């Protein structure tokens, strides 16, 4: 999993997905399960760490390992927001602090999971990920809402809340 330390200062007023030719050209006939266990970062938390200038915020991600993506969705007691990303994707890196903020604001309403599309290509193919970042909200193990592109925190929260309201 990518570390939660990279940040960018680019701002996006509207969704700006990356569409790499390699992802678009990928065959959808790939196997549905990856051979390696799925490792995700979930339950983003902020912790105070002392410094000379006062407290510094440090993000801690709770890493969990599942034998399959389906197991992760099946065992989740709350809706799951999956961020399909790549380490080379600028808008994906822009979303790192935004996802942290959203996770903090929504608390126990939703579980945030990040899936590296380069590492887990079979999962990306299964959900036909062609643009990055792509977000899919799963409720009861099934996708209920999907959107693409980098969004400010307030718009991301609106997307999540409206999807959860419709899915009730």
Curated annotation (Swiss-Prot):
Source species, domain of life: Eukaryota
Record-level GO cellular component terms: chloroplast; cytoplasm
Domain Thioredoxin positions: 59-165
Segment annotated as transit peptide: 1-58
MF annotations from Gene Ontology: protein-disulfide reductase activity
Residues with site note (Contributes to redox potential value): 90-91
Positions of the catalytic residues: 89, 92
A Pfam family this chain is assigned to: Thioredoxin
Subcellular location: Plastid, Chloroplast
Keywords, sorted A to Z: Chloroplast, Disulfide bond, Electron transport, Plastid, Redox-active center, Transit peptide, Transport
Major localization listed first in the record, in broad terms: plastid
Disulfide bridge partners, by residue number: 89-92
Family: Belongs to the thioredoxin family. Plant Y-type subfamily.
NCBIfam families: thioredoxin (TIGR01068)
Biological function: Probable thiol-disulfide oxidoreductase that may participate in various redox reactions.
Name of the protein in its database record: Thioredoxin Y, chloroplastic
Originating organism: Oryza sativa subsp. japonica (Rice)
